[in-house]
């Protein structure tokens, strides 16, 4: 099963997260299937590759709670 989850990047105390499609059995920093966006909580910036995310959701991928909250704040689920 594939999930859309956050992958931590950046420096110490300056976390930046990539939103990735990754297999459930992989660890957080494991190999991802595809990068679908990023989230910077410090600068409050979000980028979502919407066509790719929709493709993964149609194939049965499940977003984690945090990714779902970030997507709602960005207005992604309003478009559906």
From Swiss-Prot:
Supply the induction statement: Transcribed and spliced in green leaves.
- Pfam families, alphabetized: Ribosomal_S16
InterPro entries per record: Ribosomal_bS16, Ribosomal_bS16_CS, Ribosomal_bS16_dom_sf
The GO molecular function terms of this record are: structural constituent of ribosome
Q: Any idea where this protein resides?
A: Plastid, Chloroplast
Keyword Ribonucleoprotein assigned:
yes
Asked whether the keyword Plastid is assigned, the reply is yes
Highest taxon above the source species:
Eukaryota
Q: What keywords appear on the UniProt entry?
A: Chloroplast, Plastid, Ribonucleoprotein, Ribosomal protein
A Gene Ontology biological process in which this protein takes part is:
mitochondrial translation
Q: Name one GO cellular component term.
A: chloroplast
Main location, first listed in the record: plastid
- Give the similarity note: Belongs to the bacterial ribosomal protein bS16 family.
Its name, as the record gives it, is Small ribosomal subunit protein bS16c
Instruction: Give the taxonomic lineage as stored in the record.
Output: Eukaryota, Viridiplantae, Streptophyta, Embryophyta, Tracheophyta
